[in-house]
Every structure is written in C-alpha cells, then in structure tokens.
C-alpha cells in the first residue's frame, strides 16, 4: 500500500495525539528516515502544551479532528494516513481517520487492539480507530499501556506503545526503502544525519 502510494506520487500522512504523536515526530525529518511523511500536527495536542491536561481535553473534543484534517491535510484518493492511537477511542483520531476514508484515502491504524476493544468510543459515531482502518498494526501491549507490576502499587508502570510503535514503523520504513530500490529507484529520499561529518 505505501509503495503504491509513493509510486503514484500520492501523499503519506501521519497523525497521533499527545504521546501517540511521538510516532509522527519519529517519522518526520528523521536521520535515516524517508522524506515521504507529512505529519498532521495540532499545537494543542503536543506534549509541550500547558496545562498538561490540555492534550487530553483536546483529543476528546468532537469536531477538532475534522477541523485539523480540513486545515492540515488534503486527503485524496490513493493517499495513506498512518494514525497512531493506543486506545483508539478519542474523537480527534477517529475524525481524522474518517475524513481520510471519506476522501478515499487508505488508513493504517497503529493501536492496541485488545485495549481498544475493551473500551467504548468517545465519539458520537461509536467507532474506534481500528474500525476505520484498512490495515491494523497491533502493538500487543497491556490494557492501559503500562506493563510492569510493582508489589504494593495498584498502577502498573512502563508504557510500551511508543517504543514498540517506533520499532514497527521504522521496520516498515526499511521495507519501503528496499521496495523502492528493488523497483529501480536508485536513491530513495533518505535523510542524512546533520551530526555526521561530510
């Protein structure tokens, strides 16, 4: 799907809110990464927003995802949206995925399928992100994301979604670059580290 998108000169978009947005940052302008990813960033969804509760409020705000999609993306038939949402339940990610689908773009969801299936949608449609996806990449994390149980603590620690998601997507980047070379693209557009000599 991603190779066909590149071959047809279509656009690859990425989106995630709050910590899920770290994967969009990982794919964007990254040493060793491909110059093919177009992130949809919303200032109020970034981790440097204050107060720290703002990102949670904004990702639950019905209508904000549609507005972001309309103002920051130009979804077309054949485009691909990679959307990262661990729970898959919040309106902003659901609406961006729905906007992409409405415009005949493909949707790849990076999510925790067992977590998402254990919660209800916060969007009026009742949908969760995985229900809008053409391809689901399941991070197989624990429900609630944290994975380490410490004696005497009710809340687990050590979330896994970011590191697993980054590993999955960078593996896909490597496979896409290989496919591009195999198809005759001698120099796929790869970022060179700004911290290397030369």
Please provide the spans of the model-predicted regions.
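A short, well-structured juxtamembrane/interface segment
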Residues: 1-8
